[in-house]
């Protein structure tokens, strides 16, 4: 396990260095060497990185979670509904959203562990269900405090303090709060995988489920835990997304799962399960973040970025299969 993680980390770091070299080479107007570029990249990739934290746990169990983007959208809308429309306290709204995300994840995990439904099918169903829930509770409309001015611009009135905090910057306006939340999620996952018994269970289930069961590992509970944590991290990302947009949009989060999966696999976590680590996911997030920033600086459109993301996922899977 340790040897695999070290070799995967080396390959992930090589990929990151290669992307940084591309940034230095294709450096439109010197933008890549400005701190604002790196700060904005960290802020942008943090939401995807939080999603990838939960996905890492799921993928190590040899599973997959296609619902992360929709769960982000659902919890973002729920947060806006509770905070902006119903004007509930953050002490009620935040735990409610986190619990809703974790519950949805546990439902997916239960379908997989107890009813033997394939992860792809179970999480695909949850993806559709969560998107429907987002549209249902919002009436298909954005939930916002935005007021349209006569000049065509928007004024955001009565923004709750929790929205302002999640959308703020600290340390002299250099680090976004969402970036610190991403780093905290990385730390939590590291503790789970490296210091807790459940972390060993997650690796055991992904490595050989039947052997883990015969060894006394609670396989079903481990899977439900992994998917429940994935749903929890989706909710964390949803809160951050709603705060950044100052609204709850039922369409937000579409295709986010692609970027989150790309982050995990480019870091080196094996899609077949049993191998990987949260440190690899952090490196993968930096790699994808810088790659997207380089493409943006050089005026590559969203279509090109999506195609590249798909190619990265396929390439990483083929590389893992070749090594195996």
Model-based region annotation:
Residues 120-196, 222-225, 245-250, 300:
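Transmembrane helix-bundle core of multi-pass membrane transporters
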Residues 227-228, 233-234, 244-310:
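Transmembrane alpha-helical segments in multi-pass inner-membrane proteins
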Residues 1-44, 170:
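N-terminal, non-cleaved signal-anchor transmembrane helix
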Residues 1-22, 207, 214-221, 291-324:
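Cytosolic-side transmembrane-helix boundaries in multi-pass membrane proteins
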Residues 12-25, 55, 128-134, 179-191, ...:
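Hydrophobic core segments of alpha-helical transmembrane domains in multi-pass membrane transport
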Residues 20-26, 34-86, 110-117, 262-278, ...:
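Single transmembrane alpha-helix segments in multi-pass membrane proteins
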Residues 9-14, 41, 48-49, 70-74, ...:
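Hydrophobic alpha-helical transmembrane segments
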Residues 89-97, 103-108, 112, 170-247:
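Helix-loop-helix "hairpin" substructures at the membrane interface of multi-pass membrane proteins
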């Amino acid at each position: 396990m340790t040897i695999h993680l070290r070799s995967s980390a080396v390959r992930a770091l090589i990929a990151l260095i290669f992307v940084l070299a591309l940034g230095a080479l294709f450096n439109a107007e010197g933008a890549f060497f400005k701190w604002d570029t790196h700060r904005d990249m960290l802020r942008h990739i943090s939401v995807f990185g939080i999603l990838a934290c939960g996905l890492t746990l799921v993928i190590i169990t040899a599973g997959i979670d296609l619902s992360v983007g929709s769960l982000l959208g659902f919890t973002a809308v729920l947060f806006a509904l509770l905070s902006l429309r119903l004007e509930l306290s953050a002490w009620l709204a935040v735990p409610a959203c986190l619990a809703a995300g974790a519950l949805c994840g546990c439902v997916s995990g239960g379908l997989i562990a107890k009813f033997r439904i394939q992860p792809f099918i179970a999480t695909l169903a949850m993806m559709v269900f969560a998107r429907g829930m987002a549209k249902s509770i919002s009436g298909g409309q954005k939930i916002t405090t935005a007021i349209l001015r006569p000049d065509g611009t928007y004024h955001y009135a009565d923004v709750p303090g929790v929205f302002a905090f999640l959308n703020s910057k600290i340390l002299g306006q250099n680090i976004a709060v969402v970036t610190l939340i991403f780093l905290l999620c990385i730390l939590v996952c590291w503790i789970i995988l490296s210091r807790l018994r459940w972390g060993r269970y997650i690796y055991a289930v992904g490595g050989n489920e039947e052997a883990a069961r015969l060894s006394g590992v609670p396989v079903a509970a481990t899977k439900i835990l992994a998917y429940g944590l994935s749903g929890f991290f989706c909710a964390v990302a949803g809160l951050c997304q709603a705060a950044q947009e100052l609204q709850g949009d039922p369409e937000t989060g579409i295709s986010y799962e692609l970027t989150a999966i790309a982050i995990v696999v480019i870091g080196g976590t094996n899609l077949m399960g049993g191998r990987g680590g949260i440190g690899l996911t952090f490196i993968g997030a930096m790699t994808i973040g810088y790659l997207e920033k380089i493409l943006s600086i050089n005026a590559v459109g969203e279509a090109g970025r999506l195609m590249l993301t798909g190619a990265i996922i396929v390439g990483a899977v083929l590389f893992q299969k070749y090594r195996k």
